[in-house]
Amino acid sequence: MGYKTILTVITQAGQTAQLEAAVALARREDAHLEVFAVGVDHTQTGYYYAGASAYVFQEAIDRAMAAAEALETEIRAELAPEDIRWSVESAVAQMGGVSTLIAMRARFADLVVLAKPYGPKAAPDAEAVLEASLFEGGAPVLVLPHENVAVETLGKRVLVAWNQSDEALHAIRRALPVLKAAEAVEIAVVDPSPYSPEGSDPGGKLCQMLTRHGVKADIAVLAKTLPTVTEVLNRRAAESGADMLVMGAYSKSRLREAIMGGATRHMLERATLPVLMAR
């Protein structure tokens, strides 16, 4: 595809499926896999009684450090027999510093591989890791469902969600290595307005751009016959046999941080296939 540095972030034991998928993708891409093991201190020292904060703070940091070191040891043992190039690093952060720590790693990765941040199997810090990778790190992220994914064949049939936004176009450009290698790419345009800049040819300019890159692209104009765009896209993915969705990641502001907007969260909560997103 063209992704030569792949990053995955592990924050708790048991994220085996995510690590295995990242390994398989690195092997397929002949990429270097960077694994970042993070111990997160969730304590709020401001709530401790006077005189105890310094001791309790250090105790909490020590616990997080021990957890990070244990994660690193476990990951190294799992990667030792693998025939890929890999590196593992561990670090500790308080919850408020996770975003900066993750963003520093994500900004130099070609692709970040993470598990779905919602549902009973999600790691407690998964949403914060995803938001930091996307919005502060500026990296494209492949979000995997909790079920096993056949990474070796991933991206044969790709559904692209197109709504003329800057975010969608940026995601598509970051996904070009996937799209160029795919057997079929379908540009899904849901309920387009006849008064939009694309007028009577929704998706036409995008299809032309992709075709010039050698992408085997078609357009599907879909009526919004279900309550949400997410449901329309998921139904189309099932009908077309798509094994990956490419879409823009939309954000809203929370103080100085960007967090996922409702539409992006809604899709990730309900997606049954891998989603490659960027902003």
Task: Name each model-derived stretch.
Residues 12-13, 62, 92-95, 118-120, ...:
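Short histidine/acidic/glycine/proline-rich micro-motifs that form metal-
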Residues 18, 98, 126, 168-171, ...:
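Amphipathic coiled-coil/heptad-repeat helices and related helical stalk/stem segments
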Residues 24-26, 101-150, 236-279:
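Gly/Ser-rich helix-loop-strand patches that form or flank binding pockets
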Residues 55-70:
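A short acidic, glycine-rich active-site loop
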